[in-house]
Curated annotation (Swiss-Prot):
Ca(2+) 1 binds at residues 52, 54, 56, 58, 60, 63. It comes from Scomber scombrus (Atlantic mackerel). The modification N-acetylalanine is found at residue 2. The N-terminus is blocked. In muscle, parvalbumin is thought to be involved in relaxation after contraction. It binds two calcium ions. This is Parvalbumin beta.
Length: 109
């Protein structure tokens, strides 16, 4: 499953262009730029399922590191600092991973 079913190519490209430089990823700006923050709960769940590569029901640190590559093959991996900041922002219960409800709250936040 690809994001084409949820997001527009132009929005994905704009969002990725905004965080090409190492250390420049900001999840709030990215979710807004790609249009995910304005999507329905069902569409957000679809996005979560795409990012949850191992289908564990959670997005773990390794999946976050490769987050941008879900949107476009060849996109850069997040740095360790970006990955940890992203995880901290979304992991509201402190279990070291992001569940679907935490993901939805982070997108709408």
């Amino acid at each position: 499953m690809a994001f084409a079913s949820v997001l527009k190519d132009a929005e994905i490209t704009a969002a990725l262009d905004g965080c090409k430089a190492a250390g420049s990823f900001d999840h709030k700006k990215f979710f807004k730029a790609c249009g995910l923050s304005g999507k329905s709960a069902d569409e957000v769940k679809k996005a979560f399922a795409i990012i949850d590569q191992d289908k564990s029901g959670y997005i773990e640190e390794e999946e976050l590191k490769l987050f941008l590559q879900n949107f476009k093959a060849g996109a850069r991996a997040l740095s360790d600092a970006e990955t940890k900041a992203f995880l901290k922002a979304g992991d509201s219960d402190g279990d070291g991973k992001i569940g679907v409800d935490e993901f939805a709250a982070m997108i709408k936040g």
